[in-house]
């Protein structure tokens, strides 16, 4: 698998096999590039632009009313998608490597509508969103859904915590 954690301004791409990271690439781009693209077209506040990004996403291209905004977001995130594809291509070309079979997306901005589909179309592999909390038991004092809003951003802390167990 290739695990892609889309951060605000940094994205981590990690090729993993049997739970072992084999190849890591850090890209100086993230979901904020889509917000920046919206800001260049609108005088709205950053908070409103973040909401628009997560409501409209990349799928608005087919709606004439929103096509310019979605197209701008797609163009802003395209270099990141190309980096994912080139990282997988590079790794697959290494002698003795097993081919990457899928992409796992993490990070709040991985939930931008249309982003998983755009990645899947460009890398020609199945893509799925995964919560780092999936399969982990939560304490009895933790309300169900307490972490839902930011669970996709917890990959690094959860990984570090599990690594120390």
Where are these regions (language model features)?
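Hydrophobic/aromatic-enriched cytosolic interaction surfaces used to assemble or bind macromolecules
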Residues: 1-165
């Amino acid at each position: 698998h290739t695990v892609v954690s889309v951060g605000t301004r940094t994205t981590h791409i990690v090729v993993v096999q049997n739970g072992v990271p084999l190849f890591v690439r850090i890209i100086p781009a993230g979901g904020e590039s889509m917000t920046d693209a919206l800001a260049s077209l609108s005088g709205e506040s950053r908070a409103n632009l973040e909401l628009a990004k997560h409501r409209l996403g990349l799928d608005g291209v087919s709606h004439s009313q929103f096509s310019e905004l979605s197209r701008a977001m797609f163009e802003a995130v395209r270099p990141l998608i190309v980096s994912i594809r080139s990282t997988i291509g590079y790794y697959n070309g290494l002698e003795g490597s097993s081919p990457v079979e899928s992409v796992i997306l993490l990070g709040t901005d991985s939930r931008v509508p249309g982003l998983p589909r755009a990645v899947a179309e460009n890398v020609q592999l199945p893509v799925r969103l995964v919560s780092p909390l999936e399969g982990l038991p939560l304490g009895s004092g933790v309300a169900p859904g307490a972490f839902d809003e930011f669970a996709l951003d917890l990959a690094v802390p959860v990984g570090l915590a599990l690594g120390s167990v």
